[in-house]
């Protein structure tokens, strides 16, 4: 399965980033903590390679806590600044400004020496539905940026004043134009970063079950009370349908409904704290 999705507004945003880069002091690269590597857009990062960046692993409350620490160390080992946050609850959000100020302390000090006040300008970048607008709302304590739980809700860019020293630019999320790696595509579909009409939910649900059935078997068993050990992914999905009453009129199991239910449970953390990516060992 290959998801091909790159709407016109996404292409426009990419061009605008190139134009805006000369005005931006620092970028917040928002990643989904459940898939920190899969939710990176390294094609985008090439465009802004000359600017400081903070990798913000959002939705860390839904991700495996142990792996949150592992990924934070992974970025640090690669000389990249990373912080795990929960933008909804505000966990660690305040630390972002402190980190930004530290990264740009030389520019700030230089401005002070000249008798000026340095305005630090951010751009928030990330794939759809990673929580860009929610983060901005939490930082600014307002709802100036539209928020939603569907990928691509935020469209128009806007400058938002945080305080006398910080301004943030919210830009539309950008997804890799062609997801050639099926595993990456499945993970992004599973966490809700791709519109559901663009992929086969049953296919994604079964593949995702296959990804997590060993490491998180205890969570699956606790949620659905099903012993996975003797079942295939398809059989497991059918059993979920039976348990949850996903029955069609003719008595068959509605596997599409079961798949939808499973993916919803995964995204909302009802199964438990799960991370789909693995730290790359170097």
Annotated model-derived regions:
Residues 115-117, 139, 160-161:
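Solvent-exposed alpha-helices and their adjacent loops that cap or buttress functional pockets
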Residues 29, 55-57, 124:
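Structural beta-sheet core signal
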Residues 121-141, 145, 171:
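Glycine-rich phosphate-binding P-loop
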Residues 107-111, 137, 143-149, 216-220:
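Short, structured loop/turn "capping" segments at alpha-beta junctions
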Residues 92, 131, 167:
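Short phosphate-engaging motifs
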Residues 61-125, 144, 246:
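Canonical P-loop GTPase G-domain recognition
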Residues 1-27, 34-43, 47-53, 60, ...:
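Helix-rich effector regions associated with P-loop NTPase G domains
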Residues 95, 99, 134, 207, ...:
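Alpha-helical scaffold segments in soluble metabolic enzymes
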